[in-house]
Structures are given as structure tokens and as C-alpha cells.
Regions:
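Active-site-proximal loop/hinge segments that shape catalytic or ion-binding/gating pockets
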Residues: 1-172
């Protein structure tokens, strides 16, 4: 039986960041996109992306969005830690009510990748089954679907208001 609103099965979304960014997030009262951080003159912020990724985001306009993921593990975190961009990773748990905000988009993979599909959240074809149900992870097809779903992004324009972040918002 199909859900009338498939997005209602999403319990939380996540945003990973360095623990050193938490104070700035608290002080600003919101989780801001990199474009908004630049506009506000915030320079002391550790991004997860490398310079190539930040440039690609700016060129494609993806820097205007806060990037969220579906699970509290993301393939990019390992590389960001290895390269020293993130020292102590914290996953911020985000209330899925953020999906109802105007302008929220869905990316069927890493959003700044050439040719990746980005659409309005209401038109998203999210593989919720592989994200939230028990499956046979030893099946190569299921494993490939899971790895692909881990890279998908929810894109929130400009900022995620603090009311969508858990009261004790660091997770992990």
C-alpha cells in the first residue's frame, strides 16, 4: 500500500559539521548555507567540502542551500576527516518538518555533480525502502541502491531555522 505522503516516513534528516562550528550555529540561531555565511561575513567556519566542492557549489548555485542527508553516516565524512577539513564530526538531527518549507529541493546524488537530477521535494523519487527498511545487504543490487541513497541530498534554501534542530542538537 502506497503512503499518501511518502515524506511522512522520514523521521529525521541530518547535517554533518565539525564540532567547532556548533557555537557559531547557536549564536546565529540557524544553520546557514555557505552563501549566507559569506554574506554575513562569517569566515571562521569549517566546511566539510574541499575547495573544489565549494567552488562547484558556488558555480552551480548549490551554495545557496543547506545540504542535508537521510542517515547519520555519510560517505563524504571519511574523506573530509582524512584530509583534515573535519576533526570532530557531529551530526545535527533535523526535524523532517523542514521538508515543508518553501523551495526545498531533492538531489538524486551529490548535488554539485554534473548531470545530477535536482527537483522540487514534492517530485522526488526517494528510495525510502532501502533507507528505512531491513533488507538483504549482501545482495549486490540492494547494496548499490543503499550506497546511492546515502549520497542523495535534501537542499534547504538559505538556512535551517533552529526550531527544526533538536533541542540538544548535536547527535553523535
Amino acid at each position: 500500500m502506497a503512503l499518501s505522503d511518502p515524506l511522512s516516513s522520514i523521521l529525521y534528516l541530518y547535517h554533518f559539521t565539525d564540532a567547532s562550528n556548533l557555537q557559531t550555529i547557536r549564536e546565529m540561531g540557524s544553520l546557514f548555507s555557505s552563501a549566507m555565511l559569506r554574506r554575513r561575513g562569517i569566515k571562521d567556519f569549517r566546511p566539510g567540502g574541499n575547495q573544489w566542492s565549494l567552488n562547484a557549489d558556488a558555480k552551480s548555485g548549490m551554495d545557496r542551500y543547506v545540504h542535508l542527508c537521510f542517515i547519520d553516516r555519510h560517505p563524504m565524512v571519511h574523506v573530509a576527516k582524512q584530509e583534515g577539513r573535519l576533526e570532530r564530526v557531529v551530526y545535527l538531527r533535523v526535524d523532517p518538518g523542514v521538508l515543508r518549507l518553501d523551495g526545498v529541493r531533492y538531489s538524486a546524488g551529490v548535488s554539485n555533480k554534473t548531470g545530477i537530477e535536482v527537483c522540487d521535494i514534492r517530485d522526488a523519487k526517494i528510495d525510502l525502502e532501502v533507507l528505512y527498511e531491513r533488507m538483504n545487504w549482501s545482495d549486490p543490487g540492494v547494496y548499490a541502491r543503499r550506497r546511492a541513497a546515502e549520497k542523495c541530498e535534501i537542499l534547504v534554501p538559505d538556512h535551517v531555522p533552529m526550531k527544526y534542530l533538536e533541542k540538544y542538537f548535536p547527535h553523535g
